Amino acid sequence: MSKRVQAKHKLDRRMGQNIWGRPKSPVNRREYGPGQHGQRRKGKMSDFGTQLRAKQKLKGYYGNITEKQFRRYYAEAIRLRGDSGENLIGLLERRLDAVVYRSKFVATPFAARQFVNHGHIKVNGRRVNIPSYQVKAGDVIEVKEASRQLEIVVVASQLAERDVPDYIEVDHQKMSARVTRIPGLSEVPYPVQMEPNLVIEFYSR
């Protein structure tokens, strides 16, 4: 088992939830945390613990974004007008690797980050290899023609169980996608409940 898969399993077990909705998640078999003390009954979690858990879950879902980068998203979310929690979700869903994942060009957020890093994606006709690149409404994302027959792409395009959300229009023949709008929390197809307002509270302490 690779270190990346082990890390995913560990996060699922720590949260007690199947964060990415994976069939092979260990919480499908058991619902306690990792390690020899994982089966101990846990007491009531403090407000701080609840907020920390919400942050770890959201941060982990997007491929374990670095703490420094996640703090920048928080700072931008509270600077923007409107609900800060909704703003945070919008910023995360605007990440190029998130759009690549949502468009079903690859199977996981981790694969999406690597796919972008390796230069397989264009935005508005120009190659972009920065996973955190912020996509705008109306931008067109496409898989480079030379990359369209890679096994990782072919397999992902056949995943019937994961629908493309309404805020992205995808042409799987051309392997291109267009972001029609920036989504709110209720529109994002998370496999588990995300609580961005608790994340905002965590950083606002």
From Swiss-Prot:
The family database entries (Pfam families) matched by this protein are listed as:
Ribosomal_S4 (PF00163), S4 (PF01479)
Q: Where is the composition biased (Basic residues)?
A: 1-12
On whether Nucleotide-binding is a keyword of this UniProt record, the answer is: no
Q: Which InterPro entries match?
A: Ribosomal_uS4 (IPR022801), Ribosomal_uS4_bac-type (IPR005709), Ribosomal_uS4_CS (IPR018079), Ribosomal_uS4_N (IPR001912), S4_RNA-bd (IPR002942), S4_RNA-bd_sf (IPR036986)
Q: Where in this chain does the record put each S4 RNA-binding domain?
A: 94-155
Q: Where is this region: Disordered?
A: 1-49
* GO MF annotation terms: rRNA binding; structural constituent of ribosome
Q: Name one GO cellular component term.
A: small ribosomal subunit
Q: What Gene Ontology terms for biological process does this UniProt record contain? A: ribosomal small subunit biogenesis; translation
Listed A to Z, the keywords are: Ribonucleoprotein, Ribosomal protein, RNA-binding, rRNA-binding
Q: What does this protein do?
A: One of the primary rRNA binding proteins, it binds directly to 16S rRNA where it nucleates assembly of the body of the 30S subunit.
Subunit note: Part of the 30S ribosomal subunit. Contacts protein S5. The interaction surface between S4 and S5 is involved in control of translational fidelity.
> What does the similarity note say?
Belongs to the universal ribosomal protein uS4 family.
Q: What is the official name of this protein in its record?
A: Small ribosomal subunit protein uS4
